[in-house]
Amino acid sequence: MDWTWRVFCLLAVAPGAHSQVQLVQSGAEVKKPGASVKVSCKASGYTFTSYYMHWVRQAPGQGLEWMGIINPSGGSTSYAQKFQGRVTMTRDTSTSTVYMELSSLRSEDTAVYYCAR
């Protein structure tokens, strides 16, 4: 398990002081192969620009797969090699929202997509 998964798992179970933090994602979508999808994640309850945001996904019957990370402050990104050229992560500081766009969709992209602080 690499550090990104340790961070993700820690955030998933951390109780107490951060219970006011909310990440609200856009709803489910159905897309055809070759299309693109853009998922939003609106943050609240903390200083948006102070924490990096990860995107992960979980395909049916599979484990979590890390896709990439964005720095909401400067907008810099780092993507998993598997998604290079197909994924774009952006942010809008005025609405405390991050976005993940995945293009050239394939059947194997069927998954639940999550943002994680």
Swiss-Prot record:
An example molecular function term from Gene Ontology annotations: antigen binding
Chain positions covered by the region annotation Complementarity-determining-1: 45-52
One Pfam short name: V-set
Gene3D superfamilies, per database record: Immunoglobulins
Coiled-coil annotated spans: none
Gene Ontology terms describing biological process: immune response; immunoglobulin mediated immune response
SMART domains hit by this protein: IGv
SUPFAM superfamilies noted in UniProt: Immunoglobulin
InterPro entries the UniProt entry points to: Ig-like_dom, Ig-like_dom_sf, Ig-like_fold, Ig_V-set, IgHV
The keyword NAD appears for this protein: no
Region of interest (Complementarity-determining-2), ranges: 70-77
Sorted UniProt keywords: Adaptive immunity, Cell membrane, Disulfide bond, Immunity, Immunoglobulin, Immunoglobulin domain, Membrane, Secreted, Signal
Region (Framework-1): 20-44
Region (Framework-3): 78-115
Disulfide bond residue pairs: C41-C115
Residues covered by region (Complementarity-determining-3): 116-117
Cellular compartments per GO CC: extracellular region; immunoglobulin complex; plasma membrane
Residues covered by the Ig-like domain: 20-117
Signal peptide: 1-19
Chain spans, region Framework-2: 53-69
Superkingdom as given in the UniProt entry: Eukaryota
Subunit structure, interactors included: Immunoglobulins are composed of two identical heavy chains and two identical light chains; disulfide-linked.
Record function comment: V region of the variable domain of immunoglobulin heavy chains that participates in the antigen recognition. Immunoglobulins, also known as antibodies, are membrane-bound or secreted glycoproteins produced by B lymphocytes. In the recognition phase of humoral immunity, the membrane-bound immunoglobulins serve as receptors which, upon binding of a specific antigen, trigger the clonal expansion and differentiation of B lymphocytes into immunoglobulins-secreting plasma cells.
Name by which UniProt lists this protein: Immunoglobulin heavy variable 1-46
Lineage: Eukaryota, Metazoa, Chordata, Craniata, Vertebrata
Originating gene: IGHV1-46
